[in-house]
A protein has these predicted regions:
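N-terminal "arm"/small-domain region of PLP-dependent enzymes with the aminotransferase-like
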Residues: 1-50, 169, 367
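PLP-dependent aminotransferase-like
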Residues: 5-12, 17, 88-175, 182
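Phosphate-binding glycine-rich loop
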Residues: 49-95, 101, 109-112, 119-121, ...
């Protein structure tokens, strides 16, 4: 880490050395206790049982179900496949209402199965699906609602369930961000027909690659187990269409190891979040995403909205941060509706998504987890404070540099 930034010329954007010698990513994979992980992997290798619903997968499913307080956990090879299998098991067809403000996999999992994702707007306060927008999007072709717990903050579960019940729709949730979070005292995983989890290596809890569907519906769980294994019930009896969605034993070993230290990981995330909050408390125009302190949350993401009072546009700040090796990210930009194939299929979708568009142009997610410590967060806080205080000088300096570059070319 280099010396403090005192003037625009000290910014790496204008040619100075970066604040951090090595890039700081939004997250860094947690491996838990390495000795315990390697012991589990060695046990897998010694058993010669590498996949096909082995003992490590069964133990992981039970441990995760116990942690969440759900009856059934069906582990699969990734979160996207979990979405696809659940969508098929619920017999969704026609149209399903989803937010555009989500990772593209949520929409792709529907479109891949010839189901039309209908993009509803978000509530600007929660950043989750707006129940009023959902209600306005329902048509005779609508078969379900797919909510997303963005950044670990649960959707308006009760309102969405009321709409689903009243209109005869299936309700499921993409809980990829929300492992370890609660809503009204119940752990996420207990809502809707089922909830989907992602254990990709970028998540604070991971299985290298992996995912799961959790549900309290035994009949649905059986359909899911059949679907992840080609539809086999027994050695030679295929009873339904299926795919190869099985989690392997090594991934499950990582999951079991990660669960043992999940409380410590969340504690670290919370400490980082609170330190960011303290360091930017007097920075104008930066709005830190808040959590309901009465509920459990995983503090997986440190998300800020860059507002007009900051003095620079979000993307200009992003350029400054990246030049300093602070690899903040835009979550979610530009929204699913503005990506292919949806941009071409639904060119007018943007007209009904004003809050989605506004938020996607303001949000940044900052490095946290084991990627940063106290010194790094303090330095990022000082950088943000400097940029906000000197935003006018930075804009002028940037314009001057651009003019000089044009005149010399």
């Amino acid at each position: 880490m280099r010396k403090a930034i005192n003037r625009p010329d000290d910014l790496a954007l204008f040619g100075a050395p970066p604040l951090f010698a090595e890039p700081l990513h939004v997250g860094r994979p947690n491996t838990g206790n390495r000795d315990r992980l390697l012991a589990r992997i060695n046990a897998v290798l010694d058993s010669r049982r590498l996949t096909n619903n082995g003992p490590m997968v069964k133990a992981f499913e039970k441990a995760l179900a116990d942690y969440l307080g759900v009856r059934h956990c069906v582990a699969v090879c990734n979160g996207t496949l979990a979405l696809e299998i659940a969508i098929r098991a619920l017999n969704l067809t026609g149209e399903v209402i989803v937010p555009s403000f989500t990772f593209i996999a949520t929409a792709h999992a529907l479109q891949w199965q010839q189901i039309t994702p209908v993009f509803a707007d978000i509530d600007p306060l929660t950043c989750n699906l707006s129940p009023a927008s959902v209600e306005s999007m329902i048509t005779p072709r609508t078969s379900g609602i797919l909510g997303v717990h963005v950044w670990g903050r649960p959707c308006a579960v009760g309102a969405l369930q009321e709409i689903a019940d009243r209109r005869g729709l299936k309700l499921m949730f993409d809980a990829a961000h929300a492992l370890g979070c609660s809503h009204r005292g119940r752990m996420v995983g207990n809502f809707g027909e089922c909830e989907i989890l992602s254990f990709h290596a970028t998540k604070f809890f991971h299985t290298f690659e992996g995912g799961a569907i959790v549900t309290n519906n035994g009949e649905l769980a059986e359909k899911l187990r059949l679907a992840r294994n080609f539809g086999f019930r027994g050695a030679d009896n295929v009873v339904c269409i299926g795919t190869n969605g099985k989690m392997n034993e090594v991934c499950a070993a990582m999951g079991l190891t990660g669960l043992e230290s999940i409380a410590d990981t969340i504690s670290l995330n919370r400490a980082n979040y609170e330190r960011y909050a303290a360091r930017i408390s007097d920075v104008p125009g930066l709005l830190l995403m808040r959590h309901d302190t009465a509920e459990r949350t995983n503090y997986q993401y440190v998300v800020m909205q860059v507002q007009e009072e900051f003095g620079l546009e979000r993307d200009t700040l992003l350029e400054i941060l990246h030049a300093e090796n602070v690899l903040a990210r835009r979550y979610f930009y530009p929204g699913c509706h503005a990506m292919e194939p949806y941009r071409s299929l639904f060119p007018d979708a943007r007209l009904s998504l004003p809050h989605t568009i506004a938020l996607s142009e303001r949000v940044l997610s900052f490095p946290t987890g084991t990627a940063v410590g106290k010194k790094e967060i303090d330095a990022i806080g000082r950088l943000l404070s400097f940029v906000a205080r000197h935003s006018a000088r930075i804009r002028a300096h940037r314009g001057k540099r651009a003019a000089e570059k044009c005149s010399s070319s």
